[in-house]
Structure formats: C-alpha cells, structure tokens
Amino acid sequence: XXKLVESGXXLVQPGGSLRLSKXYTENVNHPATTTXYKXQPMTPDFTEXQTHEGTHQDVFDQPNLXXWKGNTLPEGYEPAKXGEXGTQDANPKXXQDGDEXTXTGXXQXDKIGRYNLXPTIFFEATPPKANENQ
C-alpha cells in the first residue's frame, strides 16, 4: 500500500519503541527495497508524553541525560563537572571497574543499567513487490 510510517514518526510497541533509523531511505519502485528500523528499550522513567523526546537514536548515540526535557537524572548520577577530562553529562558518583575512560559517542556497553545502549535491534520490513505490468 502506502508508506509504513512517515519519516520521523515512531511506532511504539509494548515494552519498547520502534523508530526509523537515521539511514532510512526508500525507493518504492524497487521490489528489493527493504526498510530498516531501530528499536530501543523504554526506560521506566519515560511516560507516554516523553516517549518521542527520550528514545530517538541520536540521543542514545550521544548520551546527554541532563538535556532530556521532562526528565531528571537517575538516582546516583550527577551532571559532569566542568573541566573533567573525558566525562559524559551524567557520571556515576562511585566509579566501577572498567568505567574510568568512557568515550561519548558510538554504542558503548556502559554499566548504566536502565540506559544500556546495546544491543541495537534492527527490524526489517519488506515493501510489496512492484506491479509486473508497470
């Protein structure tokens, strides 16, 4: 039929959010075209109204908990102090083994349980085959 979802919109399923990946492109005339989706788990802190603010992939790629609208930092975390080398915007008050140097950016296996960035699950939807008469 038509597009599965409009660009930028999110499909929310129980226990998670389903969203178009950044690299989403489509050629509706090509029968082999597949559309990739990224899914991220919902955290208990998000309400229905906060879903679209908090679960976009680029937010997970660049963790910036302080900038999430309508959210407060989870218990045990505080904003990074200016001048600290290699810190994120939310740092554990007590350091854990292997947490000393955490680089911001790409999917890292962090120890923030509710904000675990990995793994990323890809959902693929295959569009209907093109009409042979076209």
Curated annotation (Swiss-Prot):
Keywords on record: Carbohydrate metabolism, Metal-binding, NAD, Oxidoreductase, Xylose metabolism, Zinc
Molecular function GO labels: D-xylulose reductase activity; metal ion binding
Biased composition (Basic and acidic residues): 50-59
Region Disordered, annotated ranges: 31-115
Catalytic function, reaction form: xylitol + NAD(+) = D-xylulose + NADH + H(+)
EC number: 1.1.1.9
Activity regulation information from UniProt: Activated by calcium and inhibited by zinc.
GO BP field: D-xylose metabolic process
Coiled coil: none
Entry superkingdom: Eukaryota
Similarity-based family: Belongs to the zinc-containing alcohol dehydrogenase family.
Protein name, as recorded: D-xylulose reductase
Source taxonomy: Eukaryota, Metazoa, Chordata, Craniata, Vertebrata
